UniProtKB/Swiss-Prot annotation:
Keywords: Repeat, RNA-binding. Residues 188-200 have a biased composition (Acidic residues). Residues 170-200 are annotated as: Disordered. PROSITE patterns: RRM. GO terms for cellular component: cytoplasmic stress granule; cytosol; extracellular exosome; nucleus; ribonucleoprotein complex. The keyword RNA-binding applies. Pfam families: RRM_1 (PF00076). GO terms for molecular function: mRNA 3'-UTR binding; poly(A) binding; poly(U) RNA binding. May be not functional as it lacks the poly(A)-binding protein C-terminal (PABC) domain implicated in the mRNA stability and translation regulation. It comes from the Eukaryota. SUPFAM superfamilies: RNA-binding domain, RBD. The lineage of its organism: Eukaryota, Metazoa, Chordata, Craniata, Vertebrata. This is Polyadenylate-binding protein 1-like 2.
Length: 200
């Protein structure tokens, strides 16, 4: 069995619509749209399970970013192990993206560096927010993407590409920077002033 995650679904997409879209790639074992337990409304993503990995791979390669009910869907291999998902290995953070860069454009740009497990541009109700994430299958692909793409111009904007850092890592860095900054300020203050001048 091979499982695909299908995201960015329109709320009215049904299992039957997904079956119609995904069955040409090969025999399907099951399709499940994830729904709110109380309201039964779609949460905007689903899992499509194929009998054969080769069929799932074909669907991923041919249907990613296809439009269903007016929205391009984002397909990736289902990663059920949360520790692997959150480990940060192979994850790249990209910022200062132009408004024209969507999931498909980001995928097309970064797929040159290796196999992509997932790719997403952050959006709100107004559209793309100017940053995104790419999760590569291999750490080497992520490192190559960072080396080549960091500081490059994309649609006249200089982009930042770096290793994805978890919230905990970012907080630890901020704390270290604040401690270093504060001690440096006090040290500089002490060197530049004398006690009498300070009291006046």
């Amino acid at each position: 069995m091979a499982s695909l995650y299908v995201g960015d679904l329109h709320p009215e997409v049904t299992e039957a619509m997904l079956y119609e879209k995904f069955s040409p790639a090969g025999p399907i074992l099951s399709i499940r749209i994830c729904r709110d337990k109380i309201t039964r409304r779609s949460l905007g993503y689903a899992y499509v399970n194929y009998q054969q990995p080769v069929d799932a791979k074909r669907a991923l390669e041919t249907l990613n970013f296809d439009v269903i009910k007016g929205r391009p869907v984002r397909i990736m291999w289902s990663q059920r192990d949360p520790s692997l998902r959150k480990s940060g290995v192979g994850n790249v953070f990209i910022k200062n993206l132009g408004k024209t860069i969507d999931n498909k454009a980001l995928y097309n740009i970064f797929s040159a560096f290796g196999n992509i497990l997932s790719c997403k541009v952050a959006c709100d109700e107004k559209g793309p927010k100017g940053y995104g994430f790419v999760h590569f299958q291999k750490q080497e692909s992520a490192e190559r993407a960072i080396d080549v793409m960091n500081g490059m111009f994309l649609n006249y904007r200089k982009i930042f590409v770096g290793r994805f850092k978890s919230h905990k890592e970012r907080e630890a860095e901020r704390g270290a920077w604040a401690r270093q900054s504060t001690s440096a300020d006090v040290k500089d203050f002490e060197e530049d002033t004398d006690e009498e001048a300070t009291l006046r």
